[in-house]
Structure formats: C-alpha cells, structure tokens
Amino acid sequence: MCATYMFNITVIITHPTPTLRTRGPGFVRNRDLYIYKYKSNLINNLNNMTYIL
C-alpha cells in the first residue's frame, strides 16, 4: 500500500507541466483539471490512511 502512495507522490512532483502548457488552452485546462482531481483524491487517500493507522 505505502509503495503505491509514494509512487503517486513522485509522479505528481515530477510531472512535466511546463511542456504541456504549449499544447493549447483546451488541452491544458483538461490536464490541469485531471491533475487537480488526482491530487485531491491522493490527499483524501492519505487522510484515510492516517485514520486507519
């Protein structure tokens, strides 16, 4: 379990957002929305994990 969470965190930290900004406004908007949802899901999962522990 813990390994997957660490992997997700590294993916978020090393995500190449500056290169994606040149692709176009629609693509960037969808991408940012996806990353935002992904981050909020990850934060919720981490909170749930602390409750379990």
From Swiss-Prot:
Keywords: Mitochondrion. It is found in: Mitochondrion. Its main location: mitochondrion. GO terms for cellular component: mitochondrion. This is Putative uncharacterized protein Q0017, mitochondrial.
